[in-house]
Amino acid sequence: MNSAPPYAAANAVLKEFAMKKTLGIAVAALVAGASLFAEGLSVNGYIRSGISIDPKGETVKTGTWLPGDYFGGGSRLRLNINYDGVNGGATFRYQKDADDDKKFFISDNWFSGSNIKWAMGYAKFLDGKIIAEAGKLVDTYTSTGGWEDGTFGDNAGAGIGARVVISPVEGLFITASASDLYLEKYKAADDEVKDRDAKEGDLKFNEKLFGFTAKYANDAFFVTGGVHLAKSYYASFGLTAVDNLTLVVEAFINDTADVDDPETKLYPWVEYTGIENLTLAALGAITIVDGSTSIAITPAVSYALTDVISLAAESTITIPDKDIDPTDDTYAVITPSVTFAASKKASATVFASLSTDTDQAKHSFGAGVKYAF
């Protein structure tokens, strides 16, 4: 029976200690440095978690704070630290999500590097018309501005590298970036490794390093677009002319080496809050891969009865592609909930999740708590 080398466990412990130490130093340095300029410093975030039980009482899950694709979400701890000065600043996000639908606090990856969603510094030139950014990047200027609010890959994973943002006129932003988001690594069989021009695991330098994006916004609408030379693309359009109305359509195309076939995803989103205490919304998700199309539609409504009690309901309707599997049927998961607000920052929610097809999704009920700081 094969076993790991005797030093493997020690190396794993050292790597975990190094990650914890690095994360601790990064947070401490950012807080300490920004505290010198407290006027531009902000620290905020939230923790949310919940528990759900199936009607038979056989399983308990702690990975869901509140079911549902619109008002809901998984258990999560998020910490944002930002400093924005006259000539530059820094932004940092730590976010720990539930590993799956069953566990959150018991997971062992609290100090994983993937939990650092971004850690970026920036410098402003010419009164902010030119901005230089470096670190683990996040796009704060040209993201799609819709439900996904993403760019390449996703907005919480823009890679490590550098970016230049140019704003030649009011409302227009143009960016060029170089990051490791889509870069491939050298393998032992590559000629460059055999010739010792590169080491196994080194990042390959090629056109997949570069991405370009743009956004234009005025009082009536905004439009965004991005092209990455690794064959990743996005675009969006949003209407902003009507008060209390959100209307955005996003499109993402992924034809990178990470996928077997090109993927196109569309996200239409509309929300209206023009009636006091009432929110009406609908969210769509359309995925097209190799000629097959799957659709999910989520209508949602919430109403604040008082400052303390709010009612909400949503239903995610999944429409599969019959060409892939004729036996797949359309089904819906309905999630009614009641939220009790202890304050603007603290709330507790009780919920039920009811499925029209228990082979696709199970019934459940439970409760969750959220505290923002």
Put a short name on every predicted segment:
Residues 45-51, 90-96, 132-136, 176-180, ...:
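Transmembrane beta-barrel strands of outer-membrane/channel proteins
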